[in-house]
């Protein structure tokens, strides 16, 4: 069954229904529309299906308010596509926008290239600041690509990211935290400044 929808603010608009989006981001709105189309094809009313509860574990598409900051907590895992989608979500936020990007692990021979693509997107979005958490080749490659940003820091650990952020952040800022699970970027959250 064909299902056509449009996104307005935090709602998915269908012919017969206005459905609240359970997750942030255009990529998640597309996913919801696809799921509703499959359900509709199987005979499930889209408005009824949209009433289901969405339970997302910590570190996945979680919006937190902490100390005057809005945190987009994506610390659980990262792939190139997921990081690009998260950066686009950050770019859609009002106010000053900062990204803390850790290594994407297990990418094989294309790891450097894929990290450079992510850094290029961060630079193109003209974010207000980026902290890269990686002491290896990937971090240095990302820093070289994003070197035109006014605020850019390369640190070795999540805890070390608190220092540059402490100098940059002000009340009302939005901070994206995104990395592979092995980076344990969630360790940074309690260290972020209250502004």
Q: Residue ranges of each PLM-predicted region?
A:
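Conserved phosphate-donor
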Residues: 1-3
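A short, compositionally biased
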Residues: 5-11
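ATP-dependent carboxylate-amine ligase
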Residues: 8, 17-195
